[in-house]
Amino acid sequence: MAAAAFFLLVGAQHIMVSEAFACKPCFSTHLSDIKTNTTAAAGFMVLQNINCSRPHEASATQGQVPSRKSSQCREAVGVPQYITITANVTDESYLYNADLLMLSACLFYASEMSEKGFKVIFGNVSGVVSACVNFTDYVAHVTQHTQQHHLVINHIRLLHFLTPSAMRWATTIACLFAILLAI
């Protein structure tokens, strides 16, 4: 009986997924070209529910723009793959520009996670460009951070609180400064 249980445990170890990823969708649904190559992270699985901070506001804005997909809240379940992103930056459509701003916010998130020591992988998760980090490492980091600094705020993460409107204004102001510096 003990030998049978041992073999079941050994067999279950090979069935279990060896590593999970926590992914943040970049909401870039209108990018002109998303190519996946064959270097997928084989055997890896994404199990992370992405919640929006204001789901009612997102659904209200979706009713005004009929060409958008139903929701920007997605449950990212899939296999992360390395991707190439090509964006159509000459298009004057507001939706393309908004998606590029959301992609830039995702790049800021990825750089912040990289600064904290995480290896960030950009992947095509269920057709959505996502920034993925190792879920086990992320949980360990959050646990360690909350145990050491449970009530101490040692840095302000400003980029996480920027809305698309604020990103547009920040981009406009940055462009104006660049033009003034060039003159």
UniProtKB/Swiss-Prot annotation:
Cellular component GO terms, alphabetical: extracellular region; host cell endoplasmic reticulum membrane; host cell Golgi membrane; membrane; viral envelope; virion membrane
Membrane topology, as annotated, equals: Single-pass type I membrane protein
Q: Where is the signal peptide?
A: 1-22
- Lineage: superkingdom: Viruses
Query: Where would you find the membrane-spanning parts of this chain?
Result: 161-181
Q: What is its main location?
A: virion
Q: Name one GO biological process term.
A: virion attachment to host cell
Chain ranges on the Virion surface side, renumbered to this chain? 23-160
Residues of this chain annotated as glycosylated in UniProt: N37, N51, N88, N124, N134
Pfam families attached to this UniProt entry: Arteri_GP4
Keywords from the UniProt entry = Glycoprotein, Host endoplasmic reticulum, Host Golgi apparatus, Host membrane, Host-virus interaction, Membrane, Secreted, Signal, Transmembrane, Transmembrane helix, Viral attachment to host cell, Viral envelope protein, Virion, Virus entry into host cell
Instruction: State its location(s).
Output: Virion membrane; Host endoplasmic reticulum membrane; Host Golgi apparatus membrane; Secreted
Q: What is the disulfide pattern of this chain?
A: none
Q: Which residues lie on this side of the membrane: Intravirion?
A: 182-183
Q: How does it assemble?
A: Heterotrimer of GP2a, GP3, and GP4. The GP2a-GP3-GP4 complex associates with the E protein. Interacts with glycoprotein 5. Interacts with host CD163; this interaction plays a role in virus entry into host cell.
Q: What is the purpose of this protein? A: Minor envelope protein. Along with GP2a, serves as the viral attachment protein responsible for mediating interactions with CD163 thereby playing a role in virus entry into susceptible host cells.
Q: Which family does it belong to?
A: Belongs to the arteriviridae GP4 protein family.
Indicate what this protein is called per its UniProt record. Answer: Glycoprotein 4
